[in-house]
Amino acid sequence: MCAVTVVPDPTCCGTLSFKVPKDAKKGKHLGTFDIRQAIMDYGGLHSQEWCAKGIVNPTFTVRMHAPRNAFAGLSIACTFDDYKRIDLPALGNECPPSEMFELPTKVFMLKDADVHEWQFNYGELTGHGLCNWANVATQPTLYFFVASTNQVTMAADWQCIVTMHVDMGPVIDRFELNPTMTWPIQLGDTFAIDRYYEAKEIKLDGSTSMLSISYNFGGPVKHSKKHAISYSRAVMSRNLGWSGTISGSVKSVSSLFCTASFVIFPWECEAPPTLRQVLWGPHQIMHGDGQFEIAIKTRLHSAATTEEGFGRLGILPLSGPIAPDAHVGSYEFIVHINTWRPDSQVHPPMFSSSELYNWFTLTNLKPDANTGVVNFDIPGYIHDFASKDATVTLASNPLSWLVAATGWHYGEVDLCISWSRSKQAQAQEGSVSITTNYRDWGAYWQGQARIYDLRRTEAEIPIFLGSYAGATPSGALGKQNYVRISIVNAKDIVALRVCLRPKSIKFWGRSATLF
């Protein structure tokens, strides 16, 4: 009796097919996979189980079926976006790798396998369970795109198939899972940077120029089309500097026709080192693909988190590249920095953890022409505040970056409000009313209500950040609590500043904001 070789795969929960151009160019958007919709459309056991449980914490396995080809010199990436942070039209309907790499991503090299896999736990990336109904805050989506231009043009466009597989896991009894980060930020023995860098190239001209990746791992960064702040950059920007060891991997994305070897090393200066300087220090010689672990080496044993020029991961060509006469492409490779392991060096925070963090400043207030009063409503979530009744200047700091780089937040803060006036105190008239509210203003669902003389110039009031779902995104989710600031005789206000004093805040989800 013959063994059964063709069996159904009970883990499959959805499929996607897309065409790859024969001359695929870096940044080409190939396909979009809506995870929730795909499971519902595919139907079957998983859809029924999901409906029965309501909310789950599944483990997904993405399988990209692309025939192994060592000659194409092509890589395809898959980026996961749970919070609708990728706006393809705003990116020119392309997927520029540097911007996409700010979000959780896996890069597949065609030379490596016939079936390329990426397994991830949904809750670990997002911080919450997967609900079986659509909502305004989340839309788990995979974007497939060309990560590096293929070096050899194929005979024709070709089809690629993606299958999604799932283990729904046990039923869970809450939406929010363990927070991804809490404030004040505390790092453990290791921190997952999990960041790919756009393909580097060693040209076929005998050049031995040094390549590098800057150690400024924190704060917003400018890419080809957008600025970006990712989760790892937000977390690392908490401190002025960092030191320790980074580990990662290097993968060749070149055609098999082209090979080379190079050395990876820590370097501080702008000028490239001699080979002797490299070999005297910590280094790792790479022959194609491989893992690396490199300790930072700078004059002061530390690198500035948000500044260029205080350290870099150097890459120096050694041997090659070697390629046939007809080959025109460079030797290309992609660096992935996976983990940072801090050492015992002490680094101060950018700002004190108990200090105030400026949220926004209002100038050019526009009071009502008849009453002279202007109102500002500040909701119970941190976001890019806007108002038609004033000029708004948003502040930028590690707290605002962490909000932008995650999906949900929850906690308690003090709103610290201060203002400057145009008149001397003895001549100043007017007042500032500050109230905590819920629902529409006319319903008068109020908590605290205080009136301050305009001459006082400052006030504080606590507010909870959250929603009916517990945590809140950076946007309205149903009716939310809010603070209303009402200013009588507002024409005398030169500027009004709103700061946050964090008491305890939790954050969920590894993401990024492109702006």
Swiss-Prot record:
It holds the Pfam family Nepo_coat. One of its GO terms (molecular function) is structural molecule activity. It comes from the Viruses. The virus coat is formed of 60 copies of the coat protein. InterPro entries: Nepo_coat (IPR005054), Nepo_coat_C (IPR005305), Nepo_coat_N (IPR005306), Viral_coat (IPR029053). GO terms for cellular component: viral capsid. Keywords: Capsid protein, Virion. Residues 1-2 form a propeptide. This is Capsid protein. It comes from Tobacco ringspot virus (TobRV).
